[in-house]
Amino acid sequence: QEDTENALKGVLEALRVGGTYKSKYGNKTFSSAAKNAASGAVIAIDAKNGDVLSMASYPNYNPNKFVNGISYEDYQALQPKNKNDVLAANPQVNLATQGVFQPGSTFKMVTGMAAIDNGLSPNYAIQDTGVIRLGGPKSRPFADLIWHKSRSNHGYTDLYKAIQESCNIYFYTIGSGKNYTGGKDPSVKVGAKGIIEYAKKFGLDDYTGLNEEIDERKGSVPNMAAKLETT
């Protein structure tokens, strides 16, 4: 637990200045500074059984200060600098269980599993180009991170490589059922409804069960009808 808390704090400190985080497990150098990286969370899980090994949120506070009555000064120090900013660092919010965030590339597991269960071979491959336009030449471009960083691409990519290198375009392809790089379309089309179905199967619309011991917020899987009503 102590290692997790120290690592989280150290990474954020290095990230804010674009420096190097050093640890006994290896070093990580950040190429640029992210001055607003003031908060974060880490959960370490046993990949074999799902047990939570450690959990940390930053910034945090010492709960012992509340035992005999916290001072006004100490209590004010626990308040977010801007109470109108929901993203402001807040020591009293456990981001690991109370923060609700977009899942980012971890969601690729949902899309991949939905495609596999519907018959896609993991050997299905595309020739990744780094960037595609889903709606034609004048539409908004969608790109891989490697494209944004170096105008490069992942090349020949099957599901295994797509997961290993987090290839965005591969998952756009198997999710939509159309190969926008010019090759053969995947044998299945999962579509939005299929992805939503599997997101719910993964429990992304439910509590984890930790809320019996720790205050928890649950995620929300998008609803197509609700999306149309708000756009």
Where are these regions (language model features)?
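Conserved, well-ordered alpha-helix/loop/beta-strand core segments that scaffold catalytic motifs
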Residues: 1-38
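Beta-lactam-recognizing serine transpeptidase/beta-lactamase-like catalytic domain environment
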Residues: 34-35, 40-105, 110-231
